[in-house]
Each structure stands twice: as structure tokens, then as C-alpha cells.
């Protein structure tokens, strides 16, 4: 089994990657490696890039739906599948002339307007936002994936987006591996919270809701 699939977070158990043959696992891992790991859900898979990669291979889902990856990622996946290139799902962000992908973005919180509600913290798939109740929150720009999942959670609209220089191609694999690891760490942390019977808290995120559903099934 590819190393990426060793001891995956519980949320991914339903993918049943461990019962697939090695060739299938390898293809899923290769497609997942091509995806930008923003975990944005714009492909239709709210639980991240790996479920999308799995759906492409096992269920024949369209391989051109990664919005932040743009045409380069759509073409890379087409090559892995030995299929023709398809136009990438369009992005609202302009195409960067250097990377040929949609412009990379990051989020920033306007501190003077933040009310410290903590809702954006639970929405972040890579734990890039820190803060406590009634205190100003901060986003670590180097960790932010630009997924925009924090925006709709903010009751006072104090989160802005701004473009950044594209990640150099040589640095992209390491960046994506780091984002994947952070997302998996986030899932495991939420899993521990869900399983903490003594300090049970209300469900506050999509991930927690899905984990609760998994426990019931």
C-alpha cells in the first residue's frame, strides 16, 4: 500500500483504499499528489483532495474539476489516466501568467473588526487560524491554503482575500505534502474531540458531523 495510505484518518475509512489492488492504490496516490491539497471542496468533495482522487479512479468522476489547480492539474491528471485533456473547471480568480493556474490567494483577518467568535478556526482544514473566544484571531499566511472555507463562517465579514506570488514549481510538491500532512493532523485532532466522552462539545464543523455519522454506521 502506498505510504500515503498507511494509517489514514478515520474520515477516509469509507474510501476502503486498503481493499484496492496495488495498481489502483498507486494511481489514486499519483492523482492525489497532483492535486494542490487546498482541501477547498470546489471539486464537489467537501472532505478533501483524496476523496476526489479516489472518485476519479473508482467511480469515473470528471478529472477536470480541481478549481485551484486549473488547467495544469487537469492536464496532469489526464496524463496519469491516459485520457484526453479537458478544459479545467473555471475559477473566479484570474489565471496567473507564470503558473498558468488561477492566482493563489491567502486570507487575512481584519483585527479591529474581529469579535473572537472562533467560527473560522473550526472551519480551517489545516489549522492555520489561531485565537480564543472574545479575542482577535490571526491567520498564518504560510499555512493558509486559500480554500475560502473561513469566509462564510464569519458573522461580521472581517476576513479578506489577497493574491500572492505563485509557488515555484520546484517547491510545489513539498508544499502540497505539508498541506496534506496538516489536513490529516486536523482530522485526527477533530477525531479525538469527537471521541472525548468526558468533554463532549457541540458539533461545530463539517468534519465533526461526518465523523459522528461514521460512528453511527
Q: Whereabouts are the PLM-identified features?
A:
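Rossmann-like nucleotide/phosphate-binding core characteristic of flavoprotein oxidoreductases
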Residues: 11, 20-22, 28-30, 81
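Iron-sulfur (Fe-S) cluster-binding segments and ferredoxin-like electron-carrier domains
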Residues: 31-32, 45-81, 160-164
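Cys/His-coordinated zinc-binding microdomains
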Residues: 41-44, 53-56, 118-121, 125-128, ...
Amino acid at each position: 500500500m502506498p505510504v500515503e495510505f498507511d494509517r489514514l484518518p478515520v474520515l477516509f475509512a469509507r474510501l476502503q483504499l486498503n481493499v484496492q489492488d496495488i495498481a489502483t492504490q498507486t494511481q489514486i496516490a499519483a492523482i492525489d499528489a497532483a492535486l494542490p491539497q487546498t482541501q477547498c471542496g470546489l471539486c464537489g468533495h467537501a472532505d478533501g483532495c483524496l476523496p476526489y482522487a479516489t472518485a476519479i479512479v473508482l467511480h469515473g468522476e470528471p478529472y477536470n474539476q480541481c478549481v485551484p489547480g486549473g488547467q495544469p492539474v487537469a492536464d496532469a491528471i489526464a496524463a496519469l489516466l491516459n485520457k484526453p485533456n479537458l478544459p479545467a473547471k473555471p475559477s473566479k480568480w484570474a489565471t496567473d501568467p507564470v503558473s498558468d493556474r488561477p492566482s493563489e490567494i491567502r486570507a487575512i483577518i481584519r483585527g479591529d473588526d474581529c469579535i473572537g467568535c472562533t467560527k473560522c478556526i473550526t472551519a480551517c482544514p489545516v489549522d492555520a487560524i489561531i485565537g480564543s473566544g472574545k479575542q482577535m484571531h490571526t491567520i498564518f499566511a504560510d499555512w493558509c491554503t486559500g480554500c475560502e472555507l473561513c469566509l462564510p463562517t464569519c458573522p461580521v465579514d472581517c476576513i479578506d482575500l489577497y493574491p500572492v506570488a505563485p509557488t515555484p514549481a520546484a517547491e510545489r510538491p513539498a508544499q502540497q505534502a505539508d498541506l496534506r500532512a496538516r489536513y490529516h493532523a486536523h482530522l485526527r485532532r477533530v477525531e479525538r474531540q469527537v471521541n472525548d466522552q468526558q468533554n463532549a462539545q457541540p458539533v461545530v464543523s463539517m468534519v465533526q458531523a461526518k465523523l459522528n455519522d461514521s460512528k453511527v454506521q
